[in-house]
Amino acid sequence: MKHVIKRDGSSAAFDAGKIRVAIENAMLETTKGTDGKLSAEIASAIETQVGMSEREVNVEDLQDLVEDYLMSSERKDAAKKYIIYRYERDKTRDARKRRDGNLLADAFVAGFKHKPSPMNQLGSFVYYRTYSRWVPEEARREYWWETARRAVEYNCSIVPTSKEEAEQLYRNVFDLKQFLSGRTFWIGGTEVSRHYPMANYNCSFQVVDNFSAFRDVFYLLMVGSGVGVRVLKSDVAKMPKVRTDAEVIHEAYTPMLRSLRQDSSALEFSRGDTARIVIGDSKEGWVQAMEYFLKLHYSTEYRKINTIILNYDQVRSKGERLQTFGGTASGHQSMKNMFAKISNVLRKAARRSAADHVRLAPIDCLDIANIIGENVVVGGVRRTAEIVLVDQDDRDSILAKSELYKKSEDEKWVVDPEIAHRQMSNNSIYYRKKPTREDLHWHFTQMRYSGEPGWVNEEAGAKRRPNFNGVNPCAEILLDSKGLCNLTTVNVMGFARGGDGRLDRKGLLEAQRLSARAGLRMTCPELEIPEWNAVQQRDRLLGCSLTGWQDMVNAVGLSRDEQIELLKELRAAATEAAREYARELGLTEPLLVTT
């Protein structure tokens, strides 16, 4: 068999499959897509030519042949992409070698680099849309093997991890047998993950019993976490009253030069009764500006302020690229809309109470949380995921979406722009005691029309967690206020051996243990908001979850009793691994381990 000389001087057996994969990767970057027949023909032709050669063949020779064959075919578009990819990789090779001191060495990852993608077309679409980061030095997006490497290396670098564990985790992730959180696949190993650790977390929850809760909700949504919000009457009653008689003025937008922009927001005062908020050009600046805005309305320190001016000049223009998080800027208009809508909520509360100094109702807090989410979802690649938990007897909040649509002049149903922000959350009743049969009958009748409201049972949640106070937007994690959780997932169908109807039980249980260990590592970074970090260090919640269960059951034919037994084994494997690892690292044991 012919051998190929690699760049480090070692040799490896010629593999036509690697040639085919390289060609198809180039084709994937074109509008015409892949041509499996052509890639196989070229790979076969190169194999024949290499076999006839009397001299040694190196990697550069093979790449030259791929270029020649593609250029002589009808797929010159793929040839161009291949040439560009090769050129950009050559330019960055030395830099990549210098940083190859990681757990996953190039020699190990090379075995996956030329494997066909394990994803189908839909999976590939979701991956490139959601998780593949732009590689500026090579003018392309990441491939799956690179994303998996970046995320796994980040996770395993948080605390000392063995090379063997990192490699096994990588194998499973690459083969779609298990996953780290989607957030970590997007930001793991980037500057974002180091400066904004909370951006790794899928799940968070906040009780709205003070105005700083809105600051935290805004920040978490900005860094990509889904947020659960609770606005019970007893929660909102703890908040101070707000003044609603201040005039809010939005200055005309004149964008500042990039070199002159300030990241932080500023609060300026004049004439003793006027405050001006200059909104900074950063996540922190936006959050700070909203905190100033709310404080000017509720703090007695600012009771003499009757005019609030908002200046947006520092905010970058719409469409500018966001270098750190990725995507493009939403511009100043979304911020302006947010402040205008919050002002409307305060004025509505004043009209409802016939007073200028009022206490907000739960529906007002629901609106503010949704308005914040609406602002966040406008920009870049960010999305907003919210759930709002409301009282059983709070009909205003329960029916918040009942008039979301109205008829236009041409008799079409359209979203009412004044309350369009209410689309941002799923809303659920927070039952503090078991509902009656009549309650449930009414509840199901409501759900028949729109699927809402859902419900959360505090009694049931408290049995698993005494300090249970709410949930994340997907409602699979039991959380205390200011609590976070980072999901890790095992795809059980990935362990159903193809064709023979058997389950790789040993591999599945080992993956579950790896899942728990990966989750515990994610509780170790110090979070950027101290109150949230304190809860995190106290609870260290893990979110070991399973997917593909029914597919696996159908594939291997498990009975109900066998399913119950396997689920017990998986729960025990995760719990034991988490406790053992916590002791090994000298950490408190996780309060909860599985979803």
In which residue ranges do the predicted regions lie?
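Extended catalytic cores of very large enzyme megasubunits
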Residues: 1-595
